[in-house]
Swiss-Prot record:
Zn finger region (RING-type): 21-60
Organism in which the protein naturally occurs: Mus musculus (Mouse)
Protein name: E3 ubiquitin-protein ligase TRIM56
Function statement: E3 ubiquitin-protein ligase that plays a key role in innate antiviral immunity by mediating ubiquitination of CGAS and STING1. In response to pathogen- and host-derived double-stranded DNA (dsDNA), targets STING1 to 'Lys-63'-linked ubiquitination, thereby promoting its homodimerization, a step required for the production of type I interferon IFN-beta. Also mediates monoubiquitination of CGAS, thereby promoting CGAS oligomerization and subsequent activation. Independently of its E3 ubiquitin ligase activity, positive regulator of TLR3 signaling.
Record-listed Phosphoserine modification sites: S454
GO BP term, example: response to type I interferon
Lineage: Eukaryota, Metazoa, Chordata, Craniata, Vertebrata
Keyword Repeat annotated: yes
Length: 734
C-alpha cells in the first residue's frame, strides 16, 4: 500500500473548511491551537473551559488550560496568514460595497480614498489608479508587486501574495518576524533582536527552517507509516466480521433446512441453536465495534495531526513553521510512539453438526461447533509460529476424526462447549447427511508475530427463551422504474390489510406496496412536496412536508393543510387508533388534529415543566391510545398518555449510547425501537423494561431507518438503501 500522501494546495486550504471553527462553524476568529493540533476560536475555547480543562471536540483529548487562560494557548500564525489572505479578497467598503484606496487619505488629506483598481501585494493595500501608477517610484517600494484588483479578488495572485506575506510581530506592530532565538525558540523581529535577546544566538528564518524541517518530515513519515498499518488492521477487522456473518448465515440456513425435516419436538433445540448463532454474531459485532471505534479514533487523530503538519510544512512561511515546530514535533512524536492496536481478531466460525441418531428425541440433533478460519494463501508465509500451530491443530483434528468414526463420542452440550478452548476445536469431526467431513485447519488468519493476538471471541449462549422472536417473511426493493433517484424512505405506515404506504422523500412520492412487495401505485401529493412522515386515517392520508401538515384523500385531493414550527427540520406523524385523528410532533410538544382540521389537543410530555426540554424526532401510538416518542434532547424513549402525562421513560444502557430511532408498537403493547448506529431493533415491554435485541445485522439489518407495525404482528423495517424487510413477530406462547 502506498503510504505517500500528496501535499495540500493553497487553493484547497482557502476553499475547504480548514479555516472554519468546528465549534461555531464560522470563520476562525483569534485562532488558538491545542496541543493535539486542532484549532478553534479563542472565545469558543473559553466556553469549553470546565474546571481548568478543555476537551477537544474532534479527538476528545483532555487538555489542561494554562493559568493565564485559553488566551495562553499557542497562536496559530499559519491560520492567521491564510485568514488575512481570505479577508483581503473580501469586499472592503461595507457601505458602498466597493473597495477604496488606502493611500489617498494619507497623502491627499481626503476623508476617504477613491475607488481602488489595484493592490500592492507587499504592502497589502488597495490602491486607486493614480496611487498605483506612482507606487513603485520610490526606493522603498521599487520592488513591490502591484496587480489588478479584479484579478486579485478572483484568486489569480494567491500564491504570489502568500509568498510576499510577512508575519507580524505581536510585540511590535508593523515589524515583520525575521529571526529565531535558538535558546528561547522564539520568533523575533528586529526590535526584539536588539532587546532581551541581543546576546542570544539567533538564526534567520530561512536558515532555521532548513535545519529543522528534515526532523519534522521524518516524524511525519513515521506517522504516515502507522496510518497505513491502522488502515490495514481496520480492513482486516471488517473482512473477518464479514466472513463470520456469511458463515453464520450459511449455518443458519442449514439449521432451518435440518429442522424442517424433523419432528415438532425438535423445535426447542432448533431455537436454541439459532440463539447461539445470534449470540455469536452479536458478541463478535459488539467486540469488533469497540475495536473499530478505537481504531478509527486513532486513525482520525493521526490523520488530522498529519494533515495539519503537512499543510504547515507545504504552505507555511518560515516564521509560521518555526512557531509551530515545537507543538508539531511534540504531537507527531507522541503519535509515532503511541501504542497502536493489535492485529485483527482471530475469531471462531460456527459449523452445524448433526448427530447420527436423528430419530432419538432425547438427543441434541443440532449443535454448533467453532473453528478458526483457514489462513489465506497470501498470509501462509508469515511467521513460522502460525504454521506450527496449524500443524498441531491438524493433528488434534485427526484424533477427533478417529473418535467420531468409532461412534463412541457423544456431542458436547452447550454448557460443556462453553468451557472448551475454541483454539482446540480445529479439525473437529462433522457429520452432514451421514457424510463425515474433516474441517479445515486454522493457521492464524491475520495473526502478527510482532504483536499480541486479540482474544478469540466466545459466543454468549445464555439465551432468553421468553423473548418474542422474528420470523422472516418478505424482502423487496422500493425503487420503481419511474424513480429518478435512489429512494430515501423517511416514513412508513399501514395502509389497509397487509399493505403499507411508503414515504419516499427523495422522489417526492407516496408509494403503496403489499407486504410481499407487490407495487400498488401511489397516493398523489401536491407538486413540490417531499413527504417526510406519513400516517393513514379513515379514507385519508396525513403526511408532513416542508414544515406543513397535509391531509389528502386517497386520490390526492388536499382536504386541509396546517403550518408547523420551522424550528424543527422534520415532523413525525402518527395516526390515533380511532382512525379519525392524527398526531404530529412540533418543537418538543405534540399536537392532535381532528379529521376536519381542527386542533383537538396540544400537550408537552411531562407538562409545562418540560417546556424546551423535549425533541420528539419519532412518534407512534399504541393500540390503547398512548404515545411513544424518541426524544433526542433527553436521549430517551418516552411513553405518555393522551393528556401528556409521562407513564415511563427509558434511558438505560440498552441504547448503546445511540440516539433512539423509529418506534413501533404491536397489538400486545410491546415497543420495537430502532438503533440505527448499531444496526439493531431492540424490544421493550409495555412497562418500559428492556427485554433484549429483536433484530440485528444477523437478520440482514444494514442502517435501518424507519419501522411500522402492520396488523399488530408484522414489523416492517426500511433500510437506507431503499430495501424493505418484513418480519412476523412470534411470541413463545403462540
Amino acid at each position: 500500500m502506498n503510504s505517500k500522501v500528496s501535499s495540500p494546495t493553497l487553493l484547497e486550504a482557502l476553499s475547504s473548511d480548514f479555516l472554519a471553527c468546528k465549534i461555531c462553524l464560522e470563520q476562525l476568529h483569534t485562532p488558538k491551537t491545542l496541543p493535539c493540533l486542532h484549532t478553534y476560536c479563542q472565545d469558543c475555547l473559553a466556553q469549553l473551559d470546565i474546571g481548568g480543562q478543555v476537551r477537544c471536540p474532534e479527538c476528545r483529548e483532555i487538555v489542561p488550560v494554562p493559568a493565564e487562560g485559553v488566551a495562553a494557548f499557542k497562536t496559530n500564525f499559519f491560520v492567521n496568514g491564510l485568514l488575512d489572505l481570505v479577508k483581503a479578497r473580501a469586499p472592503g467598503d461595507v457601505h458602498s460595497g466597493k473597495p477604496t484606496c488606502a493611500l489617498c487619505p494619507l497623502v491627499g488629506g481626503k476623508s476617504s480614498g477613491g475607488p481602488a483598481t489595484a493592490r500592492c501585494l507587499d504592502c497589502a493595500d488597495d490602491l486607486c489608479q493614480a496611487c498605483a501608477d506612482g507606487h513603485r517610484c520610490s526606493r522603498q517600494t521599487h520592488k513591490h508587486r502591484v496587480v489588478d484588483l479584479v484579478g486579485y479578488r478572483a484568486g489569480w495572485y494567491d500564491e504570489e501574495a502568500r509568498e510576499r506575506q510577512a508575519s507580524q510581530c505581536p510585540q511590535h506592530p508593523g515589524e515583520a518576524l525575521c529571526f529565531l532565538c535558538q535558546p528561547c525558540s522564539q520568533l523575533l523581529c528586529k526590535d526584539c533582536r536588539l532587546g532581551p535577546h541581543i546576546d542570544h544566538p539567533c538564526l534567520p528564518l530561512a536558515e532555521a527552517v532548513r535545519s529543522r524541517k528534515p526532523g519534522l518530515e521524518e516524524l511525519l513519515a513515521g506517522v504516515d507509516s502507522n496510518l497505513v498499518e491502522l488502515e490495514a488492521t481496520r480492513v482486516a477487522e471488517k473482512e473477518a466480521l464479514a466472513l463470520l456473518r456469511e458463515q453464520a448465515a450459511s449455518v443458519g440456513t442449514q439449521v432451518e433446512e435440518a429442522a424442517e425435516r424433523i419432528l415438532k419436538s425438535l423445535l426447542a433445540q432448533k431455537q436454541e441453536v439459532l440463539g447461539q448463532l445470534r449470540a455469536l454474531v452479536e458478541a463478535a459485532e459488539e467486540a469488533t465495534r469497540e475495536r473499530l471505534t478505537k481504531i478509527e479514533r486513532q486513525e482520525q487523530v493521526a490523520k488530522a495531526a498529519a494533515a495539519f503538519a503537512r499543510r504547515v510544512l507545504s504552505l507555511g512561511l518560515e516564521a509560521e513553521i518555526l512557531s509551530l515546530e515545537g507543538a508539531i514535533t511534540q504531537r507527531l512524536r507522541q503519535l509515532q510512539d503511541a501504542p497502536w492496536t493489535s492485529g485483527p481478531t482471530r475469531c471462531v466460525l460456527p459449523q452445524l453438526e448433526l448427530h447420527p441418531g436423528l430419530e432419538d428425541k432425547n438427543c441434541h440433533l443440532l449443535r454448533l461447533i467453532f473453528e478458526e478460519p483457514k489462513q489465506s494463501p497470501k498470509d501462509s508465509g508469515k511467521g513460522g509460529a502460525g504454521t506450527q500451530g496449524g500443524d498441531e491443530a491438524q493433528g488434534q483434528g485427526d484424533d477427533r476424526t478417529k473418535i467420531g468414526k468409532q461412534g463412541g463420542a457423544q456431542p458436547l452440550t452447550p454448557k460443556e462447549g462453553k468451557d472448551q478452548n475454541p483454539q482446540e476445536d480445529d479439525g473437529v469431526f462433522i457429520e452432514r447427511g451421514n457424510r463425515p467431513n474433516k474441517k479445515k485447519k486454522c493457521k492464524g488468519r491475520g495473526k502478527s508475530v510482532s504483536r499480541e493476538p486479540s482474544p478469540i471471541l466466545r459466543p454468549n449462549l445464555e439465551g432468553s427463551g421468553l423473548l418474542p422472536r422474528p420470523v422472516f417473511s418478505w424482502s423487496f426493493p422500493t425503487r420503481m422504474p419511474g424513480d429518478k433517484r435512489s429512494p430515501r424512505i423517511t416514513g412508513l405506515c399501514p395502509y389497509g390489510p397487509q399493505e403499507i404506504l411508503v414515504a419516499d422523500e427523495q422522489n417526492r412520492v407516496l408509494k403503496r406496496f403489499s407486504l410481499n412487495g407487490d407495487y400498488k401505485g401511489t397516493v398523489q401529493v401536491p407538486e413540490g412536496c417531499s413527504p417526510c412522515s406519513v400516517a393513514a386515517l379513515q379514507n385519508a392520508v396525513a403526511f408532513s412536508a416542508n414544515a406543513k401538515l397535509y391531509l389528502v384523500s386517497p386520490d390526492g385531493e388536499i382536504q386541509w393543510r396546517r403550518s408547523l414550527s420551522l424550528t424543527q427540520s422534520s415532523h413525525a406523524v402518527a395516526a390515533m387508533p380511532c382512525g379519525d385523528r392524527v398526531a404530529v410532533s412540533v418543537a418538543g410538544h405534540v399536537e392532535v388534529y381532528k379529521k376536519d382540521g381542527s386542533l383537538a389537543t396540544r400537550f408537552i410530555p411531562g407538562g409545562k415543566a418540560s417546556r424546551g426540554q423535549r425533541a420528539l424526532v419519532f412518534l407512534t401510538t399504541s393500540p390503547q391510545g398512548n404515545f411513544v416518542g424518541s426524544d433526542w434532547q433527553q436521549n430517551s424513549v418516552v411513553f405518555c398518555d393522551g393528556l401528556g402525562q409521562v407513564i415511563w421513560e427509558y434511558k438505560g444502557p440498552g441504547l448503546h449510547g445511540c440516539q433512539p430511532g423509529s418506534v413501533s408498537v404491536d397489538k400486545k403493547g410491546y415497543i420495537f425501537l430502532t438503533l440505527r448506529e448499531v444496526n439493531k431493533v431492540v424490544i421493550l415491554d409495555p412497562k418500559g423494561s428492556l427485554l433484549g435485541d429483536f433484530l440485528t445485522a444477523y437478520h440482514g439489518l444494514e442502517k435501518p431507518r424507519v419501522t411500522t407495525m402492520v396488523d399488530g404482528k408484522y414489523l416492517v423495517v426500511s433500510l437506507s438503501n431503499g430495501t424493505i424487510h418484513v418480519f412476523r413477530v412470534r411470541f413463545p406462547d403462540s
